[in-house]
Amino acid sequence: MNREGKRVLSEAACDFIKDGDIIAIDTGSTAAEFADILRLRFNELTVITHSIDVFERLQGKNGFKIILVGGTFMPDEKAFCGITALETYKMLHFDKVFITPAAVSLKNGITDCGEVLMTVERQMLESADRVF
């Protein structure tokens, strides 16, 4: 998806967020674009992520609390994964989760770059009240 498409998708996703929400965001270029939009549109959020790109875009924003989930660093994804990330997400609960998978199929569901990322994303889905 091109950058403009990611921006439009990110703007639409913001309609489901309100100041004060606790949200989780996964990894990838769409997630990074989403973080840029969040920074502009909101004054007070708690954001949980295992993405370095999302963290870098949101850190330092007054009114934002950022929780960076650690684990085994995956340089190609610029994200933390593995058992540490999985166990951390099991201990957390958030209002909404925003997953930006590599592909979505009506038949097969979401697909991402690897099993390690998929395991973490599945746990994120289980830890949220609402999934986007």
Regions found by a protein language model. Name each.
Residues 1-24, 36-46, 60-63:
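HTH-adjacent hinge/linker in prokaryotic transcriptional regulators
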Residues 2, 8, 32, 43, ...:
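Sparse, context-dependent recognition of short Cys/His-centered cofactor- or disulfide-binding micro-motifs
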Residues 3-7, 11, 28, 48, ...:
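Electropositive phosphate-/nucleotide-binding environments in soluble metabolic enzymes
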Residues 18-22, 49-53, 86:
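Short acidic/polar alpha-helix capping motifs at helix-coil junctions
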Residues 24-27, 47-50, 68, 99-100:
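General beta-strand structural signal in soluble alpha/beta enzymes
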Residues 26, 32-34, 56-57:
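Phosphate- and divalent-cation-binding pockets in alpha/beta enzyme and binding domains
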Residues 53-132:
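Conserved phosphate- and dinucleotide-binding cores of soluble alpha/beta proteins
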